Amino acid sequence: MGSFQLEDFVAGWIGGVASVIVGYPLDTVKTRLQAGVGYANTFNCIRMVYKRERVFGFFKGMSFPLASIAIYNSVVFGVFSNTQRFLSKYRCGELEAGPGRSLSDLLLASMLTGVVSVGLGGPVELIKIRLQMQTQPFREASHGLKSRAVAAYQGPVHCIATIVQMEGLTGLYRGASAMLLRDIPGYCFYFIPYVFLSEWITPEACTGPSPYAAWLAGGIAGAISWGTATPMDVVKSRIQADGVYLNKYRGVVDCISQSYQQEGFKVFFRGITVNAVRGFPMSAAMFLGYELSLKALRGEHTVRSE
């Protein structure tokens, strides 16, 4: 079998759909905690969102991520799987004849995936965050909290058109530098723990990760990845949310400086609990959907040899 396999992209898309549906409500809470104001903690944020917007508030802007993030995950998993397979084959000659995947192969594949993810996912995350944040209170100069009852955007298409009109095409990549600093190490902490944990959990007699191993290893990897990515995720969310009503940040360093001066060091860990908690079910669904779809597409089964 060649090193390039299209099935990885298809399975990544299916896993991406499952991941978005499972994790979107907590993703909304995470974004509002990091970029919004007026919330004491995670549970206070959940109560406030429900009180103001009911259940629909947790799914605000989900149509765009459901369509786009699924494709984004398709590319992420396709790039990672094919890159590490190519590196292993290049290092060992024939893939089937060589030893198991090395840490260096996984590290390089994860880093490349992080770079690719920003190019494709930057606009996706920007639109998602703008739609999630558009009805939030915001702080204007020294006048305290200003509430916004009317949404700034009528939907994903209107949001894109407004950003391009007001900020140009480059506006779609607002926060790309912060996202790059988040995703390159983030995907290393995402894929590498998953690979080794799934291999460790799966019985030796099984061919490929078992469903339980994919679910558990995926969940743990997601919690680790999102937990460690939280500081730069806070910066990214603030830069991307900036521009809905105000333009207060001039870049990554300025955002870090202003956030630290105004709210202290703890601000960079805002939402870490919901990030880690949300990361488990999202990534568990992602990897389980990916592995099961991959086996189905290849006509394989997780069999136990006698």
Curated annotation (Swiss-Prot):
UniProt GO cellular component terms: mitochondrial inner membrane; mitochondrion
Solcar repeat intervals: 3-86, 101-200, 209-296
Keyword RNA-binding: no
Record keywords, A-Z: Membrane, Mitochondrion, Mitochondrion inner membrane, Repeat, Transmembrane, Transmembrane helix, Transport
Membrane topology qualifier: Multi-pass membrane protein
Pfam families: Mito_carr (PF00153)
Transmembrane spans: 9-29, 61-81, 107-127, 184-204, 212-232, 272-290
Record localization: Mitochondrion inner membrane
InterPro entries in UniProt: Mitochondrial_Carrier (IPR050567), Mitochondrial_sb/sol_carrier (IPR018108), Mt_carrier_dom_sf (IPR023395)
Source organism superkingdom: Eukaryota
Family stated for the protein in its record: Belongs to the mitochondrial carrier (TC 2.A.29) family.
Identification of the protein by name: Solute carrier family 25 member 48
Organism of this sequence: Mus musculus (Mouse)
